[in-house]
C-alpha cells in the first residue's frame, strides 16, 4: 500500500486549505482507486505540533504505486498541487506496511 501525505503550513488561510483539501480529495477519488482519504480536524497535537510548522494534514491511501502515480499525475490534480506547494506545503509519497 502507498500513502500520500500532505502537510499544510499553519500560516496558511484555513478557508484556502479547506478548498485545497476538497480539491485534492476529489481529484484523487476521480483519477485512481484511492482507498480512504482522511484529514486532520482541530488542532494538531503531540511533540511535532509544538514546532508549529504544520496546521493541517491530508492522507490518501492507494493499493498500488501505479494507482498513486496516476492520482499524482492526473491533470485535475496539477492546479491544486501547484497551489498547495505555493503555500509552502510538503507532499510525501511512501510505501506503508502493517506491523
Q: What role is predicted for each listed range?
A:
Residues 65-93:
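C-terminal structural segments of small proteins and small subunits
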Residues 1-70, 94-99:
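Short S/T/G/P-rich N-terminal loop/turn motif that feeds into the first structured element of a domain
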Amino acid at each position: 500500500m502507498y500513502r500520500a501525505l500532505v502537510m499544510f503550513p499553519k500560516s496558511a488561510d484555513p478557508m484556502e486549505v479547506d478548498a485545497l483539501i476538497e480539491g485534492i480529495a476529489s481529484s484523487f477519488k476521480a483519477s485512481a482507486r484511492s482507498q480512504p482519504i482522511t484529514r486532520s480536524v482541530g488542532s494538531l497535537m503531540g511533540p511535532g505540533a509544538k514546532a508549529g510548522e504544520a496546521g493541517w494534514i491530508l492522507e490518501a491511501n492507494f493499493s498500488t504505486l501505479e494507482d498513486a502515480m496516476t492520482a499524482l499525475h492526473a491533470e485535475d490534480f496539477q492546479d491544486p498541487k501547484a497551489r498547495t506547494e505555493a503555500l509552502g506545503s510538503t507532499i510525501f509519497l511512501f510505501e506503508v506496511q502493517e506491523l
